[in-house]
Each structure stands twice: as structure tokens, then as C-alpha cells.
Amino acid sequence: MAVKLIVGLGNPGPKYQWTRHNAGFMVLDRLSHLTGITVTRKNFSGLCGEGSWQGDRLILLKPQTFMNLSGRSVAEALRFHKLTVEDLIVIHDDLDIPFGRVKLKAGGGHAGHNGLRSLSQELGSGAFLRVRMGIGRPLHGDVVNYVLSNFSPEEMIGLPRLLDGIVDLLEMLITEGLPKTMSLYNNKELL
């Protein structure tokens, strides 16, 4: 039985609950609901839960450190469970992908994402798997304000279907592996 640490990136607190930057938290909450793995235990500077799904042991983690310090929480969890970056799946928002699309990426840089920057610094490596949920770029205005703003009413309508599609992607990733999942899902419109 393989063990995977699945991390959803976001900011804690009700103020940020429906912001674009909390896409990782939203996916993890949906995964938690569908797998029955509750993410309520306070540990590793975050909220976590453990359970079995599709024959593997999953550790779900929502760092409660705010985005730019997420790496501390993830590093603590990896050390405690004696896991490596190869056992890590990180779900995060991505400005360079349109809303409604998702991409998988193995390794890479942080592309200006403060959560990924923190992870790479704390782990000493960016060689972890990323599930990149598209949020699109603002047509005009500040990127920081955009990622910290709520999804639009139109986006909120499609959000449940998008989150379910990403959970389906995670299920395939766990059962079928990266190459097959990438070929089926990369840049696929999930709405």
C-alpha cells in the first residue's frame, strides 16, 4: 500500500474561503467529503486527516500558516511520516491556466506562486507533483487583489463540477499513474 501526502494550498479563515488562491483548499475539502477522510485534526501547523482510498493510504493536509509559509507545514508532515517529495501531491491555483482547466506537472519552479516558493525552499526541492487548477489572469488590475478575491458568480456556478473533475483526476492519478492521467487530463476543459 503506497502512502501519499496530498496538500491543498490556501489561506486559513472564513475571509479567504471562496478566494481564487484557496483553490487547493477547495479541492482538498471535496476530496475529503468524497473519501470520508475528515481533515480536522490539528497537526503539522495545519489541519490533517488520514485514511485509505483506492487501496492507498492518504494523508490530507491543509496548512494553516498562510500561503507564503506553507512549506513549513508540509516539511513537518513529510518528516513525521518519513515520506519524500516523490510521495507528495500539491494542489494549487494557477494564473496561467484558464478557469475550468487543470494541468498536472511533475517538478518545476514556483512561477511566482508564494506557496510553491515556500515549499521549494523548505523541502530543498521542487520535485513534487502539482495539480494546477486554472484560475485565469485578470484582464486588468493587480494580480494579488485578483487571487485574493472571490470567484465570480458565474465561476461559482461551475465550481462544483470543476472540483469533482479534479477529484476524478486524483483518483486516476493514484490508481493509474502519472503518464496516463496527464495524457487524459492535461489542459482538459472540465466544465
UniProtKB/Swiss-Prot annotation:
Annotated site (Stabilizes the basic form of H active site to accept a proton): D93
Keyword Repeat: no
Binding residues annotated for tRNA, in chain numbering: Y16, F66, N68, N114
Cellular compartments per GO CC: cytoplasm
Top-level division of the source organism's lineage: Bacteria
Molecular-function annotations in GO: peptidyl-tRNA hydrolase activity; tRNA binding
Location in the cell: Cytoplasm
Xref: PANTHER family: PEPTIDYL-TRNA HYDROLASE
SUBUNIT field: Monomer.
Protein name from the UniProt record: Peptidyl-tRNA hydrolase
Native organism: Geotalea uraniireducens (strain Rf4) (Geobacter uraniireducens)
Lineage: Bacteria, Pseudomonadati, Thermodesulfobacteriota, Desulfuromonadia, Geobacterales
